Structures are given as structure tokens and as C-alpha cells.
Curated annotation (Swiss-Prot):
Complexes and interactors: Monomer. Homodimer after ligand binding. Interacts with cnpy1.
Extracellular side: 27-363
Pfam families: I-set, Ig_3, PK_Tyr_Ser-Thr
Name the UniProt record assigns to this protein: Fibroblast growth factor receptor 1-A
Species: Danio rerio
Positions of region (Disordered): 787-810
Keyword Cell division tagged: no
Organismal lineage: Eukaryota, Metazoa, Chordata, Craniata, Vertebrata
Residues that bind ATP: 471-477, 501, 549-551, 555, 614, 628
Database matches in PANTHER family: FIBROBLAST GROWTH FACTOR RECEPTOR 1, TYROSINE-PROTEIN KINASE RECEPTOR
Length: 810
């Protein structure tokens, strides 16, 4: 409970708030230095505590506080200006200590987390042993003294916490205690910072735990009469390193009448415990801002020791008066940084009820509204009819099939490259009609059979195909592994492993149309080394089978994850051994191959719309192949594709114009490629870690971007940032990306394998960053803020010269 209280008060904004409290009300604060992370100390009862406040300049005054309460010099706590001493600490001395040093030009703040071990456990242990010695002196094998306190085996704690495991036991002679981690002896040099073992308390203590501390911890207790053991499982939850995120639109502007009640709400998302405060902007001598540009504010509501975050997220104003009108700010901060949103309260006097309009006016209004509604309904019906006709015409002109008299005619386009030799013939409707059974599917029960054309260039006899195990399910069908004979025309007896796409048992007519459409699209696109290629199809005398290349190593995301080096913070599995080492060259090669595949698809006028590591497959020879491109739409005659149906959207991979306007272009695919690059260099990490999807929209509009992965060079990160440019036309083309990655691949071809213990800047040439970042923030390590004067991503504020720097100068 003490640690929870300490984390709750570990905040960046305490210095600002206390400085304002110490000054006269309404006076703007001196600009503060950004405080560092709190320093943590753990002491035993009776030890001496000495803390020192080290300011960068001569200080005029130093103030010490404990849990936000000012300390005074006394017998127990001695204060010597910039030093604080407690000769013998007690458990009640645990808490968050802070020193505030006021200087001529700035204020300096330091925080200290102090934890004093309670001796109660030791007393309990001693009393148990004394009782045992009095009651029994006979030889006895070890037994647990307090088994009820050992029932909780799984302990999930946030990073930086202190963890204690206890295995108190009785026995005669007194048993010995040994600790194991993951079945092996646990030694102090195996952990950064070591650990403490208190034999008399049967306890192991690990301070400031990190993700690499995850695992199974076993206490082995034994004497010459026997042994017992108990295992605790520790899971360290990594914190999401970013400042608080406030929900967009909150608090909202309010309008109230004198005497009524008003509520402002502020929704805060933060992994480190946030500190929330409500402020009201005031005027001093007719001005709302001080000489340094900071606003005059008055604290209305501040978190106390027993105040919950939910209570702090709501500000209630009872019996509103005209003086309550003005600007209110929700200020939230943690150890990483701070955020704020403001709203206005407008107060009116009670308005007397207005006289009701006469009967004639009401009748005219009713007639006008009725006429308007009728016009709207007629217009809507006409537009819907026109849209339906246009959609039907477009559907007939596409590669997709449409049913007419129990036949599915296919119309092929001829504006394709010679690589797709099978599609060079101008489109007749049916080459050679043949019936395709629906297999009695319940969804296709109304249509017992379909007629599909036979394409001799791609047709594969069913007796040459042996289906194997399922590989997965797609949006309208399933994929099976299979062995096919005769795929290689030069070696007709050779057996090849393939993947077969087919419909599920509950498929609809549209599902069949989509599968055929994808097959025809793959025929037209042609073959390329870095895409999944069509090998053939079974369209006659049975269900439709679409035969494509088989990728033995699955998708790129899982391929990277199983090859993470031990100790990487994204994943921990003590029993997992990396399949093979990954080098910088390997990662760049993955990106280069995907870029080549996308360059080819772009040359064929195909937009992927769902480019991500999960949609890139890896062959046995580590060749990257882009999958599901057959679902893309042909855009020979238009420059963009606007999605008009609502479905599951991969929002964390989507460009802003696709998210907000549903416009898909090659440039939106480039944005997705930038996110895929981030996935590659985090070895399968999840984009925007710790950020709720509903907050992603606002953050992207404000120009936030993900930070550089630790295994990524500066040049490659600049490539990602180019892909994430707010203006689509300013993003690179896939042709340019292929050229840049080719150059990078040649420069990194002889580098060593990944070493996560050192910085990877050594792999990057001297690559100057010429990008301007007029509003970048170093306080947010999940995103970096990139916005320029010509980019439509600047935050929108009411016109005031000092808005946007309300609480801290940049």
C-alpha cells in the first residue's frame, strides 16, 4: 500500500503546484527544471537515512516535504538547508520525499522513494521458532510455518517495483534455504543490482525489477531429515513510457444558468500513476498572463492521499454564479511528462419564458418542415437508385464474377504486362462452361450449381492434388496444405508443396465471387519473386480450389518474434532458444524484399490496403512474399480507391487519409510500409504500444509518430519518418524505397549480429537529419511529434499568442 501511495505522488508537476502554493496567490511561477525519475532506497528499521538536494546553482531557499506535507526540523528529522537526516528510520518513515530548491533563475526539484522494511515479519518468525523449540526438541523434517501466506504463486508487478518472496519453514535441526531461478541456482551476479537474502526471515528481496527478472523462483528448504520446495512465478509488466494521454473532447465546454450545478470530466490514460489537478484561469491586474507568458491560475482541486483517480477526473461546481464563468484546465502529469486540456464555462442569468408563437406561425412552420422532409426522402431515394446502378455497372466491369442464369461470366482486362500470358486474350464471357457444385452448402442452397469457365493454362486435374492439414482461415475461405504433382512443366512427376484456398462450408454467393475475383486478379498481376504467386486452379467437377505458393515459415511477424535475442524487452520465455541469429543485414533484407514486392504491385496499379508483417509470408529459403494482394482493386483508370463499406480496419497500419477520409492510394500503402519497417526492427513488436485505438486518431492528427526502435539505425528511422509524412505526396515511392534499401543493404552486408547491450548507432553512417520539428517534444518516448508549417497536423487552439505553452516553455 505504501508503494502504491509513493507511485501515486511521483509526479512531474508537484514542483509547479507547490511553488505556486508558496508564492502569493495568482502570481506566475518561476520556470522549473525538469525533474529526474525518483531515486529509490530500501532500508531496515534502525538504519540511518541521509538525503541531499543537489541544485545546479546557488539556492535562496530549500524546502523538504514528505508525501506533500512540509517537514520541520526536530529531534527525529534533522534539516540542514540542502540536507535531511533521520538517525534511526522506522516503518512510518516510508514515503515520497521531495526537496524544492528556489534559485534566482529557476527552481530545482528532486524526489526520493523511501521504503523501510517492517520488522513485524521478523517478530512473527522469531515467535514461531521459539514456540517450536519450547514444544518440540525431537528431530523433524522441514515443514512450512505459514503455508496460507504462500498460496499466491503468480505475482504480476510493474517494472521498477521491489519484490519479496518468503518461504518460512520449521525443522530440527534448523533447515537451510537456497533459491533457484528457472530450476537453476540463483546467483547475485546473474542480476543487475543483485538481490538480498535474509536468512533469519526466509526472504529474498529484488529491488527495481525489470522484464528480464520474469521467471520461476523456487525456494529449496532442507535438513538431514528431508527437504521441501515452493515455486513463485514472477511476471514483470513493462510500463508504457509516455506522458498521460487525455481523451479527445474532454473536458467539454459547458453552458449553465446561475444557481445550477455543472460537471467537467477529464479522462486520463497513463501507465505510471498520474497526478490530476483542476485549475481555473484568473486575471491579475487586468491580465490573464504573467510577464513570462505563463497564465495566472488558481488550484481548485488537487489529489490528496486518500483521493482516487476516478474522483479527480470529475470537477463539480455547485450553485454556479456569474463569477464562475471562465476557462478551466485539467492538468495531468506523471514521471515522464504532463498533458492538459481546457474548456470554457459560460454562465447566463435565468431567462424568463418567451411568449409562444401564435397558431398561424406554428402551422406555417409545420408545413415547411413537412415539405422539406418529403424532398429529402425523394432525393435520398433517387441518389440510392443512381448509386445502386453505378455500383452494379462497376461490378460488371471488374474482374469479379456475377451470377446470371446460374452462370458466372468472367470479363478479363487486356491492359496488363506480358508476364501474365494467360490473361492476354480479350475477354469473352465463358471459355468452356462447366458446372461447379456448391456441395450442398446451406448458404448456397438456393443455387445448386454454377458454371465456371475452364482456363487450360491454369487448370489442374484434381487427381494430381492431395490435400493435407489446414493452415488457417481467411475472410471468406480456408487454406490447406497440399502436395501437387506436375506444377513444374519440365518435371511432370515432381511433387511440390502448395497452399490451396477454398471456400468454407457456410460460404455465400459473394464469397464464391470474391474467391474467383482474387484468382483472376492474380492471373493478371503475373509472377514476381516477392509476392505469393498463383500456380493453378481446380474449377471443374467439384469445389473451387485456388492453388498458390506455400510459405513454410509462416508470416513475417511470428518469424521475427521467434528469432528475438534473449533478454529483449518485448518478450520473455525462459525455455525458448532463438531459432537462428538475426543480423542488421537480415532485417534490412526483409524490408528490401517487401519493398521490391510492393514496387511490382504498384507498377501493376494495385493498392494493397492491408500491408503489415502478418500479411507477408516467409518461404523455406527466407524469401519474403506479400500475400492477400489479390484482394486489392484495379485502379488503371483512377488515382485512388475510396473504401465505402464498413468493416474491420487495421487502424494502426493505416495512413491518416485512409482513416479519416477512406481514401486508399499507393501513398497510403507507403505509410503502412513505414509501420511494417517499425515491426521489422522491433522484431515483431506491436505498433503504438500502450496507446488505446480510440486515442490513436487524435494523436495522428496532432502529428505524433513512433520513436526509433533500439535496433534501428538513424538512416532507417528517417526512412520510416518519410513514409509517415502527413502530406501523401511528400512520401517516397516504392521505387525510391527500393533504391534506398538497396544502398543500405550494401553498406550493412558485413556487419555483426544484433547485440542489444550496445547502441546500434555504429551501424548508421553520418546521415544528417534536415527535417524541421517546430513542436517536437522530448518528453514523450512513445511518440515523437513532427509537424511543420506546411503540414495539416498542427494542433488547433483558439487564437492567443501564448496558447499551447500554458504550463511549460519549450
Amino acid at each position: 500500500m505504501k508503494m502504491m501511495m509513493i507511485m501515486k505522488t511521483t509526479l512531474l508537476l508537484i514542483s509547479v503546484l507547490l511553488t505556486q502554493a508558496l508564492q502569493s496567490q495568482g502570481r506566475p511561477a518561476i520556470q522549473d527544471e525538469a525533474p529526474a525519475e525518483p531515486t529509490s532506497y530500501t532500508l531496515d528499521s534502525g538504519e540511518k537515512l541521509e538525503l541531499s538536494c543537489k541544485a545546479k546553482e546557488d539556492t535562496q531557499k530549500v524546502t523538504w516535504t514528505k508525501d506533500l506535507v512540509p517537514l520541520v526540523d526536530g529531534e527525529h528529522t534533522r534539516l540542514r538547508n540542502d540536507q535531511m537526516e533521520i538517525e534511526k528510520v522506522e516503518p512510518t518513515d516510508s514515503g515520497l520525499y521531495a526537496c524544492f530548491a528556489q534559485g534566482l533563475n529557476s527552481n530545482h526539484t528532486e524526489y526520493f522513494n523511501i521504503s523501510v522494511t517492517d520488522e513485524e515479519d521478523e517478530v512473527d518468525s522469531s515467535s514461531e521458532e521459539a514456540k517450536l523449540s519450547n514444544d518440540q526438541n525431537l528431530p523433524m523434517a522441514p515443514v512450512w510455518a505459514q503455508p496460507d501466506k504462500m498460496e499466491k504463486k503468480l505475482h504480476a508487478v510493474p517494472a521498477s517495483k521491489t519484490v519479496k518472496f518468503r518461504c518460512q519453514a520449521n525443522g530440527n535441526p534448523t533447515p537451510t534455504l537456497k533459491w533457484l531461478k528457472n530450476g537453476k541456482e540463483f546467483k547475485r551476479d546473474q542480476r543487475i543490482g543483485g538481490f538480498k537474502v535474509r536468512e533469519h526471515m526466509w526472504t529474498i528481496i529484488m529491488e527495481s525489477v525489470v522484464p528480464s527478472d520474469r521467471g520461476n523462483y523456487t525456494c529449496l528448504v532442507e535438513n538431514r531429515h528431508g527437504s521441501i520446495n515452493h515455486t513463485y512465478q514472477l511476471d514483470v509488466v513493462e510500463r508504457s513510457p509516455h506522458r498521460p494521454i487525455l481523451q479527445a473532447g474532454l473536458p467539454a465546454n459547458r453552458t449553465a444558468v446561475v444557481g445550477s450545478d455543472v460537471e467537467f470530466e477529464c479522462k486520463v490514460f497513463s501507465d505510471p500513476q498520474p497526478h490530476i489537478q483542476w485549475l481555473k484561469h484568473i486575471e491579475v491586474n487586468g491580465s490573464r498572463y504573467g510577464p513570462d507568458g505563463l497564465p495566472y491560475v488558481r488550484a481548485l482541486k488537487t489529489a490528496g492521499v486518500n483521493t482516487t483517480d476516478k474522483e479527480m477526473e470529475v470537477l463539480q461546481i455547485r450553485n454556479v454564479s456569474l463569477e464562475d464563468a471562465g476557462e478551466y484546465t485539467c492538468l495531468a502529469g506523471n514521471s515522464i511528462g504532463h498533458s492538459h486540456h481546457s474548456a470554457w464555462l459560460t454562465v447566463y442569468k435565468a431567462v424568463p419564458p418567451t411568449q409562444l408563437p401564435n397558431q398561424t406561425y406554428l402551422e406555417v412552420l409545420i408545413y415547411c418542415v413537412g415539405f422539406f422532409l418529403i424532398c429529402v426522402m425523394v432525393g435520398t431515394a433517387v441518389l440510392a437508385k443512381m448509386h445502386s446502378s453505378a455500383k452494379k455497372s462497376d461490378f460488371n466491369s471488374q474482374l469479379a464474377v456475377h451470377k446470371l442464369a446460374k452462370s458466372i461470366p468472367l470479363r478479363r482486362q487486356v491492359t496488363v504486362s506480358v508476364d501474365s500470358s494467360s490473361s492476354m486474350h480479350s475477354g469473352g464471357m465463358l471459355v468452356r462452361p462447366s458446372r461447379l457444385s456448391s456441395s450442398g452448402s446451406p448458404m448456397l442452397s438456393g443455387v445448386s450449381e454454377y458454371e465456371l469457365p475452364q482456363d487450360p493454362r491454369w487448370e489442374v486435374q484434381r487427381d494430381r492434388l492431395v490435400l493435407g492439414k489446414p493452415l488457417g482461415e481467411g475472410c471468406f475461405g480456408q487454406v490447406m496444405m497440399a502436395e501437387a504433382m506436375g506444377m513444374d512443366k519440365e518435371k511432370p512427376n515432381r511433387i511440390t508443396k502448395v497452399a490451396v484456398k477454398m471456400l468454407k462450408s457456410d460460404a455465400t454467393e459473394k464469397d464464391l465471387s470474391d474467391l474467383i475475383s482474387e484468382m483472376e486478379m492474380m492471373k493478371i498481376i503475373g509472377k514476381h519473386k516477392n509476392i505469393i504467386n498463383l500456380l493453378g486452379a481446380c474449377t471443374q467437377d467439384g469445389p473451387l480450389y485456388v492453388i498458390v505458393e506455400f510459405a513454410a515459415k509462416g508470416n513475417l511477424r511470428e518469424y521475427l518474434r521467434v528469432r528475438r535475442p534473449p533478454g529483449m524487452e518485448y518478450c520473455y520465455n525462459p525455455d525458448q532458444v532463438p531459432v537462428e541469429n538475426m543480423s542488421i543485414k537480415d532485417l534490412v533484407s526483409c524490408a528490401y524484399q517487401v519493398a521490391r514486392g510492393m514496387e511490382y504491385l504498384a507498377s501493376k496499379k494495385c493498392i494493397h490496403r492491408d500491408l503489415a508483417a502478418r500479411n507477408v509470408l516467409v518461404t523455406e529459403d527466407n524469401v519474403m512474399k506479400i500475400a492477400d494482394f489479390g484482394l486489392a482493386r484495379d485502379i488503371h483508370h483512377i488515382d485512388y480507391y475510396k473504401k465505402t463499406t464498413n468493416g474491420r480496419l487495421p487502424v494502426k497500419w493505416m495512413a491518416p487519409e485512409a482513416l479519416f477520409d477512406r481514401i486508399y492510394t499507393h501513398q497510403s500503402d507507403v505509410w503502412s510500409f513505414g509501420v511494417l519497417l517499425w515491426e521489422i526492427f522491433t522484431l515483431g513488436g506491436s505498433p503504438y504500444p500502450g496507446v488505446p485505438v480510440e486515442e490513436l486518431f487524435k494523436l495522428l492528427k496532432e502529428g505524433h509518430r513512433m520513436d526509433r526502435p533500439s535496433t534501428c539505425t538513424h538512416e532507417l528511422y528517417m526512412m520510416m519518418r518519410d513514409c509517415w509524412h502527413a502530406v501523401p505526396s511528400q512520401r517516397p515511392t516504392f521505387k525510391q524505397l527500393v533504391e534506398d534499401l538497396d544502398r543500405t543493404l550494401s553498406m550493412t552486408s558485413n556487419q555483426e549480429y544484433l547485440d542489444l547491450s550496445v547502441s546500434l548507432d555504429q551501424f548508421s553512417p553520418n546521415f544528417p537529419d534536415t527535417r524541421s520539428s517546430t513542436c517536437s517534444s522530448g518528453e514523450d518516448s512513445v511518440f515523437s511529434h513532427d509537424a511543420g508549417a506546411d503540414e495539416p497536423c498542427l494542433p488547433k487552439f483558439p487564437p492567443h499568442p501564448n496558447r499551447g505553452v500554458a504550463f511549460k516553455k519549450r
